């Protein structure tokens, strides 16, 4: 199944009703997204061997929350939605969408917010990034979007990505349209921006029992049926792994066909699970999956592959 975003004026009344039944896309609702993530990261940091890094990630998430309200984004995306729909492309495609300098503003505001909380090597990284030219910032952004992770140091990548993510999430939240699921090209990437998922979540509430993949860039979620590999769409050789028991709120779904895995979080097991935070806090499960010979099909925005990985 592929997912297309249809401009509001092109949706018939029957399509509008259908789109409301099982939403193929859940556009980001940015109110409290970053505060909730920061709180969850701090909570998970307790008694976790990665506690210090989880608390560092929480500081970045909190800075995103502050900067989000200090620098709102206003733009009309109607024409872009129509063009993308005609071309069958994501409307905010990371590979073709021109980047506005707004994300530079977001980055420098985040740096200003973070500096008083930093010391030692972390402060040196932030100060070095603060001095980077616009060209250097754009080169790092392009490298990350091209998955050329060796070209961006692993200590700078999460900060660059955090600013880009906030920019893309602001744009995604302004999209004027609804989504329609269609048979066609497989869509293991975000239908809004083309980036990768960070994890998937089986939700509660109005989308009870439905699984949505969570974009690691624009914070959009898109529906993928359960018991199907989100990477290759096969279902014959899926297995579920956890570090606890069958009732664990965080599991890894592995696929023997393509040799990859993706975390799957269950809100019914723990309503507080958060797509980015719980994925980052369960790296021991990633190590286990690597031992079993599976490759990760997602990237956490706070942990990028380094050179040689």
Swiss-Prot record:
Annotated GO CC locations: cytosol
Keyword hit for Cytoplasm: yes
Claim: Cytoplasm is one of the keywords in the record: yes
Alphabetic keyword roster: Cytoplasm
Source taxon at top rank: Bacteria
Localisation per UniProt entry: Cytoplasm
Alphabetical GO biological process terms: protein maturation
GO molecular function: ferric iron binding
Family: Belongs to the FdhE family.
Main function: Necessary for formate dehydrogenase activity.
Stored PANTHER family: PROTEIN FDHE
Entry protein name: Protein FdhE
Species annotation: Salmonella dublin (strain CT_02021853)
